[in-house]
Each structure stands twice: as structure tokens, then as C-alpha cells.
């Protein structure tokens, strides 16, 4: 799923004639699931890594995780060096981002403000849809079609 998310980020940005390389991405959430501080085996970490490797400038906001390691195995054995520090969510960070990427749907994110201030939003958790927030600047993952339909 991380590769699909990163590819979709590229498609969304291409829609405004912008490349993923050099774009500013604001990733909201790094933990494994909402409202916890555990990021072990979180696909959000892999998404962060892939975005970085694609040349995007990524800021991460997560009110539950203050610092994370891309390679947790290295952190366990002391080989990781400094971790990636998350930032507090501010209106300035939202406004500076070319794309806001919601990867963990924490309860305390101000979703209405995010949707109003962001240039583009890619909501992988349906956090905005759940709150009935809609806009032509909000993108979601395609809903898979059941083979039984």
C-alpha cells in the first residue's frame, strides 16, 4: 500500500502540473493507528521513506509521536543516529505544503481547518469523509470493487 499512496501523491501533483520531486508534502500521522504513540511496523513510516526517496520535502506532524526512526531495527541496535522529529501542526505548515497527506486519522487533528487551508489533501484514512468534509481539492484512495458485486 505505501507504493500505491506515493504513486497517487504523484498523480495528484501532476494534475496541477507539479512533480513529486521538489514538492512540499505535509504528512499527518506516523503512528500505526489513531491516537497511539506506537509507530512500529506502521506503513506511514515506509510512505515517508518513499516520499523522501522520490525527492519530496516531507514534514511530519503527529501529536502522539515526537520522534521516529525510519529503520527501527537500526534504532534498536543503536545504529540509527538521530531520528526524524515531528513538528507541531500549524496553519503555516498547512499553507506551505503543496499536498497534505493524511496517513493516520488522529482524533485531535483540526480537519475542518486542514481542509480549508490546504492547497490539496490526499486523505488515505477517510478522516474528512467521515466528518462530511468535501471539496474538489480532497482526494481519496479508490474504493476497491468487490468481486461478488
Regions inferred by a protein language model and the residue ranges of each:
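Structural/interface elements that position substrates and couple domains in central-metabolism enzymes
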Residues: 1-149
Amino acid at each position: 500500500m505505501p507504493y500505491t499512496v506515493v504513486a497517487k501523491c504523484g498523480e495528484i501533483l501532476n494534475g496541477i502540473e507539479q512533480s513529486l520531486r521538489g514538492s512540499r508534502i505535509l504528512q499527518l500521522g506516523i503512528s500505526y493507528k489513531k491516537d497511539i504513540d506506537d509507530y512500529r511496523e506502521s506503513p506511514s513510516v515506509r510512505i515517508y521513506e518513499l516520499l523522501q526517496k522520490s525527492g519530496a520535502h516531507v514534514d511530519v506532524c503527529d501529536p502522539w509521536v515526537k520522534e521516529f526512526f525510519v529503520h527501527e531495527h537500526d534504532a534498536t541496535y543503536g545504529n540509527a543516529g538521530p531520528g526524524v522529529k515531528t513538528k507541531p501542526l500549524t496553519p503555516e505548515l498547512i499553507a506551505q505544503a503543496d499536498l497534505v497527506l493524511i496517513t493516520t486519522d488522529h482524533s485531535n487533528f483540526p480537519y475542518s481547518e486542514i481542509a480549508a487551508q490546504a492547497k490539496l489533501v490526499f486523505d488515505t484514512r477517510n478522516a474528512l469523509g467521515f466528518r462530511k468534509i468535501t471539496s474538489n481539492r480532497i482526494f481519496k484512495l479508490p474504493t476497491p470493487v468487490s468481486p461478488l458485486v
